[in-house]
Amino acid sequence: MATGLLAKKLGMTQIFTAEGDCIPVTVLEAGPCTVVRRKTAEKDGYDAVVIGWGEVDEKHAHRLTKPEVGVFKKAGTPVFRHVKEIRVKDAKLLGELKAGDVLTVDKVFKQDQRIDVAGVTKGRGFTGVMKRWNMHGAARDSSTTHEHHRHVGAIGQRKTPGKVWKGKHLPGHYGVDNVTIQNLTIVGVEADKNLLLVKGAVPGHNDGLLFVNTAVKGQPRVKKVQEVRARAKPKV
């Protein structure tokens, strides 16, 4: 199967393990996604599949361009609101996929698997340097004017260089950035509800669009994990 799915963030909660440990988890509604197109190295220069998620009704289908609608019409699939292209390195896996195939969460992911989650962070509007860049701020004593406690301070010199360098940390818009959180662990898969329980937090607000993919940095070795857990158990 493909290595990733489009998902929606539902919110955060907590679960308890058999040992009684409390784990914070994020609940994701992942898929089911439909294969819209298959790309091959012979025709397109690389191997990939394009998946779609979130059907668009006839009322809103007119917002798409004719070329966009033509892609779905050629594949014989419904019109989707979100599409994502996934590179596929395994030629055998690519050969098994075809337009119209449905990818469900239990076919793509399993428990204890490592994943990468990409999304857009929450927008926080115009913020100062202390919130945006974690700057320390000026001294809180009588030598500093009250208005300058949270200011950026000096941003350059005099004639040399005679300018403010590009990339200087200044006040500005904070958030709405594309961020990928790597090596998160799946602690639960509920196939009947298309849900993924992911340990930790993921980018964005509730109902935000996410892309969940297999971790690029590899999966943990099962034997090694079992050895670490065995050593961590307290001796009675």
UniProtKB/Swiss-Prot annotation:
GO biological process: translation
Origin: domain of life: Bacteria
Disulfide bridge map: none
MF-aspect GO terms: rRNA binding; structural constituent of ribosome
Location of the region described as Disordered in the Swiss-Prot/TrEMBL record: 139-163
The keyword Ribosomal protein belongs to this UniProt entry's keyword annotation: yes
The family this protein is said to belong to: Belongs to the universal ribosomal protein uL3 family.
Record HAMAP family: Ribosomal_uL3_B
Subunit composition and interactions: Part of the 50S ribosomal subunit. Forms a cluster with proteins L14 and L19.
Stated role: One of the primary rRNA binding proteins, it binds directly near the 3'-end of the 23S rRNA, where it nucleates assembly of the 50S subunit.
Protein name from the UniProt record: Large ribosomal subunit protein uL3
Gene field: rplC
